[in-house]
Design a protein with these regions (language model features):
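N-terminal helix-turn-helix/winged-helix DNA-binding helices
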Residues: 2-8, 47-81, 85, 96, ...
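Append "Primarily bacterial transcriptional regulators
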Residues: 12-13, 43, 287, 348
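Short coil turns linking two alpha-helices in DNA-binding domains
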Residues: 19-24, 36
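Short beta-strand elements in bilobed, periplasmic/extracellular small-molecule ligand-binding domains
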Residues: 93-104, 208-241
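Flexible loop/hinge segments that line or gate small-molecule binding clefts
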Residues: 130-173, 193, 267, 293-305
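Hydrophobic alpha-helical segments within soluble ligand-binding/sensing domains
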Residues: 163-189, 209, 241-251, 269, ...
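An alpha-beta-alpha
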Residues: 174-217, 336-353
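Flexible loop/turn connectors
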Residues: 249-359
Length: 359
């Protein structure tokens, strides 16, 4: 006779039509969470009927930690934009007695897949992506089991919650500003612009739309990027800074006729500024430079970078609040049948790195 299949909380959740997190919390007698007597009875009766063996006593503290743990998936931590997001997530999580665990993928699809396999078997409070997931279908599958929130430009086909920035609008806003200053030849400096990197694509598209709306020749926009192989070969923790530095040096060696450099984010823009300074150029006298994200370093007096603000700290807090509210509202609902979408409007922050083009 074959060995009988072990009944899990997932089996019970599917049997009665409740979320796995709800079933797990009831069976583990989770503190500080209340469920109706009807819901508790449904779960306990189903567990008994299916033959569920509660082994929570063997790892009670670790199970409790998992139920109250939010996993944050970041590409890397060298960009202070991600550090700010994580700080805001931790800040808000403490209010709801959540702990936060951060993992990095370096935007590697295989690494992301391995984490998916691990996370799909855990009873977590929720997952927050700080960048668009490489495999949308797998993130959608996770959302059927627990709250999943992405921060940033929302990818097509996603069926999970999001706290968004309209990247096209952000790119258009900056492009419009530079054009109004008189910059009609602009180089867009970016890490690889590929299908999955939608924030980079959207910001670049926004710049193009700004040119089109003002009747300017889009051929005067130069996209300066590198291959994925080149990007992955950069041996430094400050990878985005290095991208900005190397691509700007290439543009200068090629004799660019652009009067402004627009970087896909502030860390890349800092690399642009360093390259220009190393070659003896003055900013904004010789070249204007701008970025996106308004990280802390951008506001320092010696840098004073023109950029786009999009409420980074608030977005991290909102992501945690979405997870918390999902647990409150879905105690009697199967899975998570509704999707929340919040969008922040970009704001132009004008500082000292931009001005009228050189004569």
């Amino acid at each position: 006779m074959g060995k009988r299949k072990k009944i899990t909380t997932r089996d019970i959740a599917e049997y009665i039509g409740l979320s796995q997190s709800t079933v797990s919390m009831i069976l583990s007698h989770k503190e500080n969470v209340s469920f109706s007597k009807e819901t508790q009875d449904i779960v306990l009766q189903a567990a008994k009927k299916l033959g569920y063996k509660n082994e929570i006593h063997k790892s009670k503290s670790s199970q409790k930690d998992l139920h109250q743990t939010i996993v944050v998936i970041a590409p890397h931590l060298s960009n202070s934009y991600y550090a700010t997001l994580i700080h805001s997530i931790v800040y808000e999580a403490k209010k709801h007695n959540y702990s936060v665990f951060t993992i990095t993928t370096m935007r590697n699809a295989q690494q992301e897949d391995s984490y998916y396999e691990l996370l799909s078997n855990l009873d977590l409070a929720g997952i927050i992506y700080l960048y668009p997931p490489t495999k949308i279908s797998k993130a959608n599958a996770l959302f059927k089991r627990m709250p999943v929130v992405s921060i940033g430009d929302k990818p097509q086909g996603s069926r999970f919650d999001s706290v968004e920035l309209n990247g096209v609008r952000a790119g258009h806003l900056m492009g419009e500003y530079l054009l109004n200053l008189g910059h009609e030849k602009i180089t867009f400096i970016s890490a690889p612009v590929m299908g999955k990197e939608i924030s980079r694509i959207h910001r670049y598209e926004g710049l193009i739309h700004a040119f089109e709306d003002q009747g300017k020749d889009v051929q005067n926009i130069q996209l300066k990027t590198m291959s994925l192989a080149q990007y992955e070969s950069i041996q430094t923790e400050n990878i985005e800074y290095q991208v900005g530095y190397e691509l700007t040096m290439e543009a200068l060696e090629e004799g660019t006729d652009s009067t402004a450099f627009l970087a896909n984010n502030d860390m890349t823009a800092l690399g642009v500024l360093s390259a220009l300074k190393s070659e003896g150029y003055k900013v904004p006298k010789d070249f204007s430079v701008a970025g996106f994200d308004n990280i802390l370093m951008s506001s320092l007096p010696d840098i004073s970078l023109t950029t786009i603000e999009h409420a980074t700290f608030l977005k991290g807090k909102e992501a945690v609040d979405i997870i918390y509210k999902k647990h409150l509202k879905n105690n009697m609902q199967k899975s998570h049948p509704y999707i929340l979408r919040l969008e922040y409007e970009p704001e132009l922050i004008i500082r000292k790195t931009t001005g009228k083009p050189r004569k």
